[in-house]
């Protein structure tokens, strides 16, 4: 079964020699999948394994999906330049991960996306935006 999801990468854990086990947060909930070969030097999908990668992920497989393709929607890597912004965004990702079973994922996904964009693109204090997301 092939499907594509629009998701934000929450976490990537090393698996085998060059693979990552990733947790993707989408409007449908959390999806755990494998990104193959992205730890190699010339990997084409390396961008899709970065924290806060906002992409359309192409998945193949039912029980344990494998990411076969990804196209980036927006680049949130600029948040890494500011420690406070980065920390606030990572806290929001962790909160979204832990609360995904108890909340409406579609609403939570959109709220997370709005909060990350607020932190990156506006002059609002990152701590205030993160606190508002967590409420």
Where would I find each of the regions flagged by the language model?
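Non-catalytic alpha-helical scaffolds and adjoining flexible linkers that form interface surfaces
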Residues: 1-21, 25-135
């Amino acid at each position: 079964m092939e499907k594509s999801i629009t998701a934000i990468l929450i976490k990537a854990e090393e698996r085998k020699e060059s693979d990552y086990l990733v947790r993707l947060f989408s409007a449908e909930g959390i999806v755990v999948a494998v990104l193959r070969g992205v730890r190699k030097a010339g990997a084409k999908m390396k961008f899709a394994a970065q924290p806060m990668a906002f992409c359309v992920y192409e998945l193949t497989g039912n029980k344990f999906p494998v990411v076969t393709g990804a196209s980036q929607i927006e680049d949130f890597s600029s948040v890494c330049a500011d420690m406070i912004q980065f920390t606030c965004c990572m806290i929001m990702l962790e909160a979204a991960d832990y609360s995904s079973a108890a909340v409406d994922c579609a609403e939570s996904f959109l709220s997370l996306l709005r909060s990350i964009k607020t932190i990156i693109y506006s002059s609002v204090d990152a701590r205030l935006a993160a606190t508002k997301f967590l409420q």
